[in-house]
């Protein structure tokens, strides 16, 4: 459907060029998206597509959206982005970290097109970045994980060793340890955002190591299916994944991109859009905590929700000292809070995690 | 310490989709047809098998339906290449794209649904895994010891000669393509019904391409396919286990290990072939060439 739409919009370009604008009919604003996975992944890409649908609902005929799904990170992304820019999209959302350099390259070639890049840190005159503080949600998941594990081993399926993922691993671990000093964390890198078979194998490997709570930073529901088979528990990632509730999915981190997307499209429509970096979290509504199910004891649920509330109110920051780096050197002193710069470049594990970050 | 038996059991199931798909492709290629649509046939099998298993509650019926569905989509390829004499490489790629799109389209309502539970076979291993292993000697026997297998190989080695001897080249090839489709379908269904336990769009994630590479790796022998699939699956599983166990080996090395191992063996095989050429062990002579009877 998306490809066909794209073809149709490509075919329309010459027609627009030739037609003299006798009728002052306003052309709809064209908004394009590239996704790293299929919209049916039930996780990360699915949530971005919900955001796209929210734009259509909000603005109706004033916007026209297109998307290209399953775009590999790397050179192919440049082709997809150029394609969208050539098709007349004035605002393009690139929704994965690995699209960062392609976005910067293509944006330089199309100075009139505005680009929005998710989870990256490179900006330009016409490139804005946006991200969500997933680590806030991870703190809540870590608390539940630390309380729920019986083997005192929790597992984490990482995608790529980039700051966003490392923040999540650290945040989960810090908060699991806080409620359960005996907890250990095993980390497996899948080197993919979306590969259900590999994610399932990674979950099996963790379970074979004695892990009974699995956290994931990959996009499919395969690890949850594996957890269920083995009697372990896990969490919804990016999307609610409520099909697996009440167990193995005991809670979830939900990315809600709709408010940001609507805001930015609105700004393009009224001409106030400018390049900036946005990083909202639980307080801004971009990170939501999915329902904590009855598989979790009431007091643990209460504790988790209390943590969530204190993060939302700004009273507590998940990275508050005293915290040491993995090698034992001091990172944050008592009461000191990590800065956004430190977090967005985070490339180390905190003390207590035995796994090494691939370098 | 990592228990070798548990790694082996994980490897058995992780490599099964590739074992099926590669064995099917082996037979197809031995008949002289290069079908690059394995990925497409696998994903159609994954979807059809999952849908049938979900609808009937019986994983067994799911696998049967997956085989039928895989064979059915492979017939579009057979039609293009055997009757319309279209280029096999292009048609195969088209079949992959077609299969991925078709499955994505019809798979929408099945997203998020869980697969019915399977009754495990011996050693708490899925019956389909054992079936995949059993297919290896069966296919070896068929190719090397049966008359039908000899004809199939003859068609693959030199279709003009086979035609001159009166063998129905086209029918043999269509049958082989159908068999390859059915096997790829079962492999795909194993992924959705037994490994991932649900349907997800794009879930084959390149397994079909690995199966194609393993056929080359195997030097077109059934035992080689099993060895290749186990090597690839084994290293994949092992690297994940090593990571989970926190063994201090650089993760990048572990991640590339399956591919690296495959490349090394390919180099060894081609070196060995260069120095000791043995008949009937390299690529089939008519592989990838279309056949039409001049008279």
Positions of PLM-derived features:
Chain A
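A residue-level marker of the well-folded mature domains of exported/periplasmic proteins
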Residues: 24-359
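N-terminal signal peptide c-region/cleavage motif recognized by signal peptidases
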Residues: 19-21
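N-terminal secretory signal peptides and thylakoid transit peptides that target proteins
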Residues: 1-11
């Amino acid at each position: 459907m998306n490809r066909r739409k794209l073809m149709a919009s490509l075919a329309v370009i010459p027609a627009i060029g030739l037609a003299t604008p006798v009728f002052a009919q306003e052309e709809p604003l064209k908004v394009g998206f590239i996704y790293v996975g299929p919209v049916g992944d039930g996780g990360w890409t699915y949530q971005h597509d919900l955001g796209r649908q929210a734009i259509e609902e909000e603005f109706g005929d004033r916007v026209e959206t297109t998307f290209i799904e399953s775009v590999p990170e790397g050179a192919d992304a440049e082709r997809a982005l150029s394609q969208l820019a050539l098709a007349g999209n004035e605002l393009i959302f690139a929704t994965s970290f690995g699209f960062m350099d392609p976005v910067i390259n293509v944006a330089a070639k199309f100075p009139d097109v505005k680009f929005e890049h998710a989870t990256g840190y490179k900006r330009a005159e016409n490139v804005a970045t946006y991200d969500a503080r997933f680590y806030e949600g991870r703190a809540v998941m870590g608390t539940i994980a630390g309380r729920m594990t019986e083997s005192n081993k929790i597992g984490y399926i990482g995608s790529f060793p980039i700051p966003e993922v490392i923040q999540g691993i650290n945040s989960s671990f810090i908060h699991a340890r806080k409620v359960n000093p005996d907890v250990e964390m095993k980390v497996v890198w899948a080197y993919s955002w979306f590969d259900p078979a590999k994610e399932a194998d990674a979950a099996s490997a963790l379970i074979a190591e004695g892990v009974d709570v699995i956290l994931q930073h990959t996009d499919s529901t395969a690890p949850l299916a594996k957890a269920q088979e083995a009697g372990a528990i896990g969490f919804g990632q990016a999307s609610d994944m409520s099909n697996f509730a009440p167990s193995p999915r005991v809670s979830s981190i939900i990315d809600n991109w709709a408010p940001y997307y609507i805001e930015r499209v609105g700004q393009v429509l009224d001409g106030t859009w400018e390049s900036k970096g946005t990083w909202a979290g639980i307080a801004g509504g971009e990170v939501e905590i999915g329902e904590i199910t009855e598989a979790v004891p009431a007091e643990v649920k209460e504790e988790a929700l209390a943590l969530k509330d204190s993060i939302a109110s700004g009273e507590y920051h998940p990275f508050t000292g005293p915290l040491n780096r993995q090698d034992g050197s001091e990172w944050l002193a008592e009461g000191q809070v990590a800065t956004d710069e430190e977090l967005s470049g985070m490339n180390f594990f905190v003390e207590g995690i035995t796994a090494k970050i691939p370098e | 310490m990592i228990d070798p038996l548990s790694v082996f059991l994980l490897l058995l199931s992780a490599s099964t989709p590739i074992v099926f798909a590669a064995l099917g492709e082996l037979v197809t290629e031995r008949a002289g047809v290069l079908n690059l649509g394995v990925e497409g046939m696998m994903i159609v099998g994954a979807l059809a098998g999952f849908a049938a298993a979900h609808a009937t509650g019986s994983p067994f019926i799911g696998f049967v339906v997956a085989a039928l569905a895989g064979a059915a989509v492979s017939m579009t390829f057979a039609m293009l290449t055997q009757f319309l004499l279209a280029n096999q490489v292009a048609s195969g790629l088209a079949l992959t794209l077609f299969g991925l799109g078709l499955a994505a389209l019809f798979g929408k309502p099945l997203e998020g649904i869980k697969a019915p539970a399977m009754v495990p076979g011996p050693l708490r291993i899925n019956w389909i895994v054992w079936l995949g292993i059993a297919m290896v000697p069966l296919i070896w026997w068929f190719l090397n010891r049966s008359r039908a297998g000899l004809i199939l190989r003859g068609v693959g080695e030199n279709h003009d000669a086979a035609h001159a001897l009166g063998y129905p080249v086209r029918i043999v090839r269509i049958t082989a393509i159908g068999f390859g489709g059915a096997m790829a379908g079962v492999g795909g269904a194993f992924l959705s019904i037994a490994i991932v336990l649900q349907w997800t769009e794009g879930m084959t994630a390149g397994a079909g391409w690995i199966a194609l590479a393993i056929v080359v790796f195997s030097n077109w022998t059934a035992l080689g396919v099993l060895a290749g699939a186990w090597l690839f699956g084994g290293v994949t599983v092992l690297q994940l286990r090593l990571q989970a166990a926190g063994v201090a080996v650089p993760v990048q090395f572990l991640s590339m290990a399956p591919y690296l191992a495959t490349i090394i063996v390919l180099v060894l095989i081609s070196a060995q072939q260069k120095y000791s050429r043995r008949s009937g062990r390299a690529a089939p002579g008519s592989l990838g060439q279309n056949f039409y009877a001049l008279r």
